[in-house]
Amino acid sequence: MDIFNNAQQAWLVLEDGTVYEGYGLGSSEDAIGELVFNTSVVGFQEILTDPANANNIIVETFPLTGNYGVNHENDLHESITARGWVIREWCAQPSNFRMEGRIDEYLEKKNISAIFDLDTRAITRKIRDGGVQNALITRTNPEGCKDELVAKIKAWKKPMPAWVNYNEKVSFEKLDSKYSITMVNRSEERRVGKECRSR
């Protein structure tokens, strides 16, 4: 499978007016968020579902992602918390004994916009040198409407994460142990409870 087959053009527009052209992946809806970078080599699924990345558009510096596919156990939260994803290249033929699907299928299912075939390290240097800024992933060509898009990006304010008002109680099965643990649930990663139970 060629990752460029049937791929639609997409653009990453920064609030300073910089525009990068690539190809869309996942949802075709526009996504506005705070542009940040991540230097991890693996763990893309955990990065996208980490509550700490709520409302961010994440730029991956590692040039290839998705080569081991996705599975439900790697999600740190029930839903993807990131707004969007910027990558260099994704693997259309992943291989792993735990794999349940490909990254493109995962993004479509979760309704998350992504863009690929960009120089993510150049974008990372821009963030590092110039600071964090808002950005937009869109499948609409910004030529002729860039000023309106930039105004929209600048006007976007990062919302308060939903977990600030998180009131749901979650109980884990009781284990025979002399210890009890209580966690204040601020939409913590699923793994925290799982790890507590395993020790």
PLM regions: where:
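Conserved small/polar residues in nucleotide/adenosyl-binding loops
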Residues: 188-199
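RNA-binding accessory domains that recognize and position tRNA/RNA substrates
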Residues: 1-187
